[in-house]
């Protein structure tokens, strides 16, 4: 499938509240996360097809869906967006100063809001994809989201963006499987794992588990690691005993346009 962005009709069912209404564009990740980068967006199925020039679409600011209403895009997500963008900017500032890039660093974040920012933007991926389990956490900032999912994070020092909603991993031999939402864009990556018992086969990123009991606006010190990071295509490029499942309607990659 080749998509034309922004994907979605001007009217339809909002992916967050479920109401049939006018729909607005939502960038994944938030537009303020990384602005002014010309990209070519393609479905993961096209990107891994083996073609030298997989089908893609020009997009100035990444993956953009017209799938949520103005109210949800504004009053519901804006607070979460601010926390998510603030986190990305703090990491960017560290990466810009080589003297700060040590084995270990920490930043201040609002983990409950950041987690909902990730969920909110992943909820906007795809058309007519309302899920009550998503909306309950987005409309209630005191819900038990971080006890229902395990939100992994890591520093992502690569270009391009990866957005995977319709994605799952299974480790063969009865070692578990899970639906996994993946959002990667310089300088951060997140993997929201819906089966908290699931363990990646080769590497375990840090998670938000210790913040599950935090208040919505409560701040925390978040540790960052800059060594031993996985490659650009982890975890979707599987090896060993892990297999990956995905559907192209909810799995996209965006690469910087080549100059010249």
Model-derived features with residue positions:
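C-terminal, charged low-complexity interaction regions
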Residues: 131-260
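Generic structural hydrophobic/aromatic packing signal, biased to beta-strands
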Residues: 14-17, 118, 183, 190-192
């Amino acid at each position: 499938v080749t998509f034309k962005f922004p994907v979605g009709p001007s009217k339809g069912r909002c992916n967050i509240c479920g109401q049939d209404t006018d729909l607005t564009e939502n960038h994944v990740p938030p537009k303020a996360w990384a602005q002014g980068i010309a990209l070519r967006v393609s479905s993961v199925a096209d990107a891994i097809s083996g073609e030298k020039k997989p089908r893609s679409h020009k997009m100035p600011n990444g993956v953009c869906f017209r799938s949520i209403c103005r109210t949800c895009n504004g009053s519901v997500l804006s607070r979460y967006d601010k926390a998510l963008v603030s986190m990305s900017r703090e990491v960017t500032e560290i990466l810009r100063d080589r003297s700060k890039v040590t084995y270990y660093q920490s930043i201040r974040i609002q983990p409950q809001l950041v987690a909902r920012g990730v969920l909110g933007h992943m909820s906007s991926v795809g058309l007519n994809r309302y899920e009550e389990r998503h909306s309950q956490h987005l409309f209630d900032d005191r819900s038990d989201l971080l006890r229902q999912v395990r939100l992994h994070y890591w520093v992502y020092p690569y270009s391009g963006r990866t957005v995977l909603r319709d994605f799952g991993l299974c480790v063969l031999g009865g070692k578990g499987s899970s639906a996994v939402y993946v959002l990667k864009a310089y300088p951060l990556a997140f993997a929201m794992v819906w089966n908290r018992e699931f363990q990646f086969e080769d590497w375990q990123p840090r998670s938000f588990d210790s913040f599950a009991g935090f208040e919505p606006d409560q701040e925390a010190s978040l540790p960052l690691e800059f060594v031993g990071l996985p490659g650009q295509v982890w975890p979707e490029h599987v090896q060993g005993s892990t297999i990956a499942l995905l559907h192209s309607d909810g799995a996209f990659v965006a690469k910087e346009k080549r100059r010249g």
